[in-house]
């Protein structure tokens, strides 16, 4: 009896320890585990995605008789993020949020994993409720079209008048659906799901001013979350002009460390997009070296941030070394995505060179400057005589 009691106590301690480590347990059940090729799915993968949608497998699980389990440890300070369970046909997957607790994933068929139902943790329960908005809207459209068919006949639906009426019904429900989404997200503005959905699903339908109001509606403590930062950058990128705040882009340095543009708040920043394969960019290196020498004692006031769009990191590094550009305090970053990178797109960079001057509050002073304007503007900064037209209220 005593041994059994001790074993029970140790079992309880072990279970408690698992949850004390912030583990996300995902229990999946697939009713019909047959893929399109007729074979049963054997393995699934838990994948994360970067800002470009590139997936990384973080865990895998065997599927036995339609069941699988992931036990994924979540660090105590990790934000709640969306992952995807993959391994199904045509790169389809099950989107869910990884957070401490147990998530139940019920999938009717392996051929359509997107229709899976989630339950068990706060964000996933809320996400399932949010997805119901789409389901309800689709059902309303289907019922309305069916009512038209019963009233006028199915052949009438194929007529010009019938098709126009179906389009009217679909457009009406689409507007109602977007309104329901906005209302839902505002009502649940403290969920990490909210800024993600605001950016991906809602913002494309909003004006710049409305998108900015949506951004401001997010719960203040959530504003350090990566999804909020991404949403905020997307909103700011829509309206870049002199006097407006610019996006807070990430810059990967040569040593692999990532810094943010806003890490230099309180200083004037020269943001310099360039490429070693661009002749004019290389000509500007000499101007910027002279500028660096003239301002290196003023790095508490002014900093140069150069973001290379070279696709070849080695070529970029060689260019820095061969041209004496690896200098203390001159931030040199690289983005191998070129003009397709998020940073380039958010700043509207179509080609290099592209230089932007930013004030200590993170607002644009000058956009797409030539080298001579850069020199003039920096002289104004050092002399305390900088001026620019504030267009943010126009």
Q: Can you annotate each of these PLM segments?
A:
Residues 1-25:
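Bacterial Sec-dependent N-terminal signal peptides
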Residues 21-172:
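A non-transmembrane, solvent-exposed segment enriched in polar/low-complexity residues
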Residues 91, 103-104, 110-113, 117, ...:
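N-terminal targeting signals for export/organelle localization
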Residues 265-266, 273-290, 311:
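Conserved redox-active cysteine motifs that mediate thiol-disulfide chemistry
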Residues 283-307, 380-386:
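Conserved helix-turn-beta segment immediately C-terminal to the redox Cys motif
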Residues 317-353:
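Short, internal strand/loop/helix patches
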């Amino acid at each position: 009896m005593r041994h059994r009691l001790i074993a029970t106590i140790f079992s309880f301690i072990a279970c408690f320890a698992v949850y004390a480590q912030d583990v996300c347990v995902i229990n999946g059940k697939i009713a019909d585990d047959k893929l399109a090729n007729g074979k049963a799915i054997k393995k699934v993968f838990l994948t994360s995605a970067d800002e470009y949608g590139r997936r990384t497998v973080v865990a895998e699980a065997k599927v036995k008789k339609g069941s699988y389990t992931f036990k994924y440890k979540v660090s105590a300070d990790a934000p709640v993020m969306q992952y995807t369970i993959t391994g199904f046909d045509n790169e389809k997957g099950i989107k869910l949020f990884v957070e401490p607790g147990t998530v139940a994933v019920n999938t009717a068929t392996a051929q359509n994993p997107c229709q899976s139902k989630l339950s068990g943790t706060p964000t996933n329960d809320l996400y399932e409720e949010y997805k119901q908005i789409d389901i309800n809207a689709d059902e309303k459209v289907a019922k309305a079209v069916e009512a038209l068919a019963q009233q006028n006949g199915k052949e009438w639906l194929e007529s010009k008048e019938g098709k126009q009426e179906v389009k009217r019904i679909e457009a009406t429900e689409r507007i109602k659906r977007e309104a329901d989404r906005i209302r839902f997200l505002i009502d649940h503005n403290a969920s990490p799901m909210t800024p993600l959905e605001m950016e991906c699903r809602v913002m494309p339908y909003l004006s710049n001013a409305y998108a900015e109001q949506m951004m401001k509606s997010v719960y203040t403590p959530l504003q350090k979350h990566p999804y909020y930062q991404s949403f905020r950058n997307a909103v700011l990128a829509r309206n870049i002009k002199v006097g407006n705040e610019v996006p807070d882009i990430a810059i990967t340095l040569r040593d692999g460390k990532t810094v943010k543009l806003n890490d230099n708040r309180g200083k004037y920043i020269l943001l310099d997009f360039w490429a070693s394969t661009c002749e004019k960019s290389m000509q500007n290196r000499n101007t910027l070296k002279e500028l660096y020498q003239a301002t290196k004692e003023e790095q508490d006031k002014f900093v140069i941030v150069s973001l290379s769009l070279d696709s070849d990191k080695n070529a970029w590094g060689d260019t820095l070394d061969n041209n004496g550009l690896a200098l203390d305090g001159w931030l040199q970053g690289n983005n191998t995505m070129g003009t397709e990178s998020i940073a380039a797109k958010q700043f509207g960079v179509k080609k290099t060179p592209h230089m932007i001057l930013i004030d200590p509050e993170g607002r644009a002073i000058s956009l797409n400057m030539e080298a001579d304007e850069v020199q003039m503007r920096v002289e104004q900064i050092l002399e305390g005589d900088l001026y620019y037209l504030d267009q943010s209220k126009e």
